[in-house]
Structure formats: structure tokens, C-alpha cells
Amino acid sequence: MCRLLGYSSRDAAPVAELLGPENFRAFTSLSALHADGWGMAWYAGSRPAAWKSPDRAGSERVYDKLGWQPLGDHGLVHLRWATPGLPVSDVNTHPFSYGDYTFAHNGAIYPQERLAAMLPPEWERQLAGSTDSERYFLHIMWRLAERDGDMIAAIADTVAAISADYTTTSLNAILLAPDAMYAISFYDRSMVPVEKLREFGHGDDADEVAAYFDLAYQATDDAVLVASSGWPMPGWTPLPSAHVLVTDRRTLATTVLPIRTANS
């Protein structure tokens, strides 16, 4: 399980400035639980750049340093809480990149012993690590090629295929393309890891548990932000499950579209 934060803004700006210092600290504090690595990706042009580490975000000066730099106008932040059985390592740390696209995921896909069947062999060979998340991303890239660049169709095909063939807790994700940000909301509230949360002192607040997989977004004239729950987000707009928020990088126009699957 992980925490997600994505942004598109008029001009290159520090993500800490877009959120505000207090909110950036609040989001970063979630790394006390989501302590198995962190990553940032950003676009200053048409190609993504990234920095990631398998250590805890709140313990690394470089995380705060990057958070206060105007890296780009389009980017994401990921805090990882590793799924048991998937190693904490550089190659398993989000975000993942393929060509001009970059991606981060919150959730788990089971059973792990069947993950290799998620991709055709030629796409499985593209893996850098061993996670369900990277395979989820490459599945979208595979479908994108089959769909002649139709990202919404590729996302819908992927979510439908994975949710039909595997058990998923959440397929929440942020996918950045050179021209748009896609925030994918697709989760099962019954799959919130309550016992794991309780191990870390977080599972007794019913509202917190119920909202664990929630995504919400904030759109202003200067920026669009989308993020996971767990910190104060007054005035943000909930992004319902089985929907994708599309943000046009150039205009900052937002569109919320349903993800069509057999069960949604």
C-alpha cells in the first residue's frame, strides 16, 4: 500500500509550494507508515526525469530538497509501503518509466505467483523489478500500443483484465504522459489492510480505515493536484472509484471519466 501525489501547474514550481508548506509536511509525515521507499518524477519538457530511493522519505534530506525545487510543471510523488513478498529495493521503488510515460501505484495484486501471466513474454522481459505495480504499468503500455495511443481505452482494458483475473485491493495510480496526467481510482474498500494498519497504530479510526484508498483532487487556475488520503484535504473533490481524472497539461482542463469494466 502506498501514497500518491500528482500535479500539473501553469509553470514549473516546487511541489511543496503547490501544496503549501504545512500540507507538504503533512503528506510527508505519511512516510512514517509508508516507509519502504519514495520517488519523485517530473517533466520540464517532453521527457520524464526521476529520483527514487528505497529509504523513508521523511528521513532523507534529498526528499525535502527536491520538494522545494521547481523541477517541472508536471510530476508526481510516491511513498511506498511494500506488499509482503515484494522486496524493498531500488528497482522495485516507484515511479516506473517507459518511453515518455511514468507511473506510480497504490495497491496490491494477488496471487503473486501468477503475476508473470499478466503480460505477454515480450513485455515481461521489459521488467526492471519484480512488482505487481510495474507489471500493471507495462500492461497499460501494452494495451496503449494495441489501442493506437488511446490512453483511456488502454486504462479501461487493463483495469478490466486485471480485476477479472486477479484479486486486487486497489488499482489506484497516477500515470503521467507528456501532455496529460491520468489519476486512476479503482479500489475495494473491503480490502483495506486493517490488521496491518493496526500494527502501526492506525487501524482503530473507522473513518480513517474507510477512507484509506480514497483519492481526491484540487483544481485552481494555476494547478491541479491529486492525492491519496491520510492528511487534511478540506475543499478537495473526491474522485470516485472506477473513474479516471484526466488533466490536460497545457490548459489544466480536467475531465472525470468512468472506467468501464464488467463489474462497474
Feature-to-residue mapping (PLM):
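Gly/Ser/Thr-rich active-site loops/lids in small-molecule metabolic enzymes
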Residues: L127-G129, F186-L215
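A conserved acidic, glycine/proline-rich C-terminal tail/linker
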Residues: F200-H243
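Short, compositionally biased leader-like segments
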Residues: G6-S9, Y43-G45, A50-H78, Y136, ...
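Catalytic core of PPM/PP2C metal-dependent serine/threonine phosphatase domains
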Residues: D148-D188
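Long, charge-dense
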Residues: A116-L144
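Conserved beta-strand-loop-short alpha-helix elements that form
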Residues: C2, Y101-P111
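Short acidic (Asp/Glu) patches
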Residues: F24, P54-L66, H78-G99, M118-W123
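Extreme N-terminus nucleophile/cap motif
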Residues: M1-G58, H202, V224, A242-V246, ...
